Amino acid sequence: MASIRELHEQLVKKERSAVEITQETLDHIQELEPKLHSFLHITAQQALEQARAVDAKIAAGEEIGLLAGIPIGVKDNMCTKGIPTTCASRILENFVPPYESTVTQKLLDAGAVVVGKTNLDEFAMGSSTENSAYQVTANPWDLSRVPGGSSGGSAAAVAAEECVVALGSDTGGSIRQPASFCGVVGLKPTYGLVSRYGLVAYASSLDQIGPFGKSVEDTAILLKAIAGYDHQDSTSLKVEIPDYVASLKPDLKARSKLRIGIIKETFGEGLDSVVEQAVTKAIEQLQRLGAEVHVISCPNFRYGVPSYYIIAPSEASANLARYDGVKYGWRAPEGDNLLSMYKRTRATGFGAEVKRRIMIGTYALSAGYYDAYYLKAQKVRTLIKQDFENAFKNVDVLVSPTAPTTAFKAGEKTADPISMYLNDLMTIPVNLAGLPGLSVPCGFDEQGLPIGLQLIGKVLREDQLLQIAYAYEQSTSWHLSQPKIS
């Protein structure tokens, strides 16, 4: 599939119509979905209507933006008016939002064509997209393996060219880890840069919406469209949004002395040797492009996972208390009274992983353990943030592997929650600190599975991350590889 810019030029020159591009995309989805299961809902009728509106503008001689007529996937935890939003949970299987999330409204205003809602781990809780109540998404590079999670449907859809770009959400790595597993670009913005209004909450102090793309430029274009202040989100940042696309240049030498820090705690035990080799070569390539490389220590990095799995479940236990079968969503048919209906609805409506995290969170917040667990985890979070602040006194950007391994086999880790949680070892600290993080393809293992390089930036320096990722991407060919889906 062509890039956003290439498709835009084809539309403007009237070489192809938006309807033709949309129909080709829908046909491609129809062909691949029996194997991939990237989408929970395919919105063919609405997509074609949106495409016809773009064609009408072009026919009338009106100017269109870069995203007009571009097929986009949206993770199914973002509210879409009149279109089911299930969060891949049985408890929301019949929920159709009466309003549009801010990010999807921005896409519609830009003329983008939403071709469907993508699969995820239930309520975005997972690292493999195996926790969906409806289907398990396959990795386009190897159908027996997972695409990562929780935004696995979005990552797989972009990798398989079922859409040009897609939206995901990232609470502890849910954009970057699937991007690494599927060989695409994924960016988690600074906390507050993108509105969370209409995003179904998992952990409100950590959740952030971000873009997936086949290339850095496509990712930058989508970020530019969704970033910005929103009065409907109390955590939204009132800041000027730079032109992320204009800052993309293929050479780092134009920058004055770019300093990159290697987080030494992300190398060593638990990291696959093939991942370490690929990331090391990527760092060497950044040096050749003009970057100055330093080794940096973030001593509390290793405590990211244990602190996250107290903070995030605690917030989830509060956020998910609203699902009781009364106002919306699914309700258990049996029940002698209101209390038994509540219990049955939640017991049968939530999956095992969601119930596990609600229980962990409720326990951590209980009177006898609040100080010992929740408050202590918040103190560790502060230490992790301070580690990053100290590191950024000496360097501009930090690098690490995105994930410790390449994509694993479906079913391999489902019986071992701790092993599954460790997939986000490299990404979780970035969320705890509210920083921007980006994963860019940097190689393949001996089985042909993608590997990702993680770039971590200072607050609101997405422009710098995208610039570095773009320079690296343009000097390599990893992003040009395409999975062969048989």
Curated annotation (Swiss-Prot):
It catalyses: L-glutamyl-tRNA(Gln) + L-glutamine + ATP + H2O = L-glutaminyl-tRNA(Gln) + L-glutamate + ADP + phosphate + H(+). The active site is at K75, S150, S174. It holds the Pfam family Amidase. Allows the formation of correctly charged Gln-tRNA(Gln) through the transamidation of misacylated Glu-tRNA(Gln) in organisms which lack glutaminyl-tRNA synthetase. The reaction takes place in the presence of glutamine and ATP through an activated gamma-phospho-Glu-tRNA(Gln). This is Glutamyl-tRNA(Gln) amidotransferase subunit A. The gene is gatA. One of its GO terms (biological process) is translation. Its EC number is 6.3.5.7.
